[in-house]
Amino acid sequence: MTELIAEATGGDPEGRRKYVRLSLRTLAGKVKSVSHTTVRRLLKQLGYSLRANVKRLSGPPHPDRDRQFRYIQRKQREFLKAGDPAISSDAKSSELIGNFKNDGSLWCDRGDEVNAYDFRSDAQCRATAYGVYDLAKCRGHVNVGTSGNTGEFSVHSIRVWWKKESRRYPHARRLLIKVDGGGSNGWRPRLWKRELQRLADESDLRITVCHDPRGASKWNDVEHRLFGPISINWAGQPLRSLEVMLNAIRGTTNASGLKVTAQLDRHRYTTKIKVSDPEMKELNITRPKTCPHWNYTIA
């Protein structure tokens, strides 16, 4: 078998990862009186097995990656120790609402029949869930929008969360927001910062923002502590309507006692809004010496 697969083996000649280009039946056809099941057993004995691609590589790490993570940890400890609100927020990947397959499985007497193809034209709409996770309270709120995932939508989702949860922080004068480095709430978009200024003015809060460094968005707390349980709860359940989606989100919990609220946001958010230089100069924004492009406070 080793000689048979030698010419069909690819991979790094100096590394440990190798693969066989031929199928089991093709290999079996090259040997008399050997079935493909026998070929499978022999390949396993040689250390081969079926494997899928793994999305793990995120490019070279930014030189300030560790420095930024240490800064975020210090800020989070500072806010939590003082009893001030600290949240992790982001937008979940958008979902087609309709009779479409939803990855995962669930216990039932028979599987649901869904559309064979995920055509946008067959969907009622495309829904984007923006989640806000309270790092101290183990509580989450999800704002489900049906238009663009913009800076306005992101900040409004945080605004809605604050209106619901501010009673839990009656003496708060500041808010920490942990977000990733890209998307509508990334460190580059001007609209995100302008809307945060409006939120700060409305709420009389000093808003401190810390962005995750490049390639580290999967470490954001909202991904694991809110979106992960939500995905598990609706796994295998077609999101045939917005109400089904909202109920699945609201019914999410875990062993840590997670509680989640959700609401529908039908506002039409305009895309491609330009924020001018004069508008940016009006923002009351300060930056620390540590990674100033990723950290700032708006008051």
Residue spans for each PLM region:
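Short, conserved catalytic/metal-binding motifs centered on acidic residues
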Residues: 1, 27, 39, 90, ...
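A short, amphipathic alpha-helix used for macromolecular contacts
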Residues: 1-34
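Extended hydrophobic secondary-structure segments that form protein cores and membrane-embedded regions
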Residues: 21-22, 88, 174-181, 209-214, ...
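Charge-mixed, compositionally biased segments that are often intrinsically disordered regulatory tracts
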Residues: 37-113
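Electropositive, glycine- and tryptophan-enriched low-complexity nucleic-acid-binding patches
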Residues: 112-178, 183
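C-terminal accessory extensions appended to soluble enzyme cores
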Residues: 167, 236-299
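RNase H-like two-metal-ion nuclease catalytic core shared by retroviral integrases
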Residues: 187, 209-231
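Two-metal-ion acidic nuclease core segments, chiefly of the RNase H-like superfamily
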Residues: 192-209
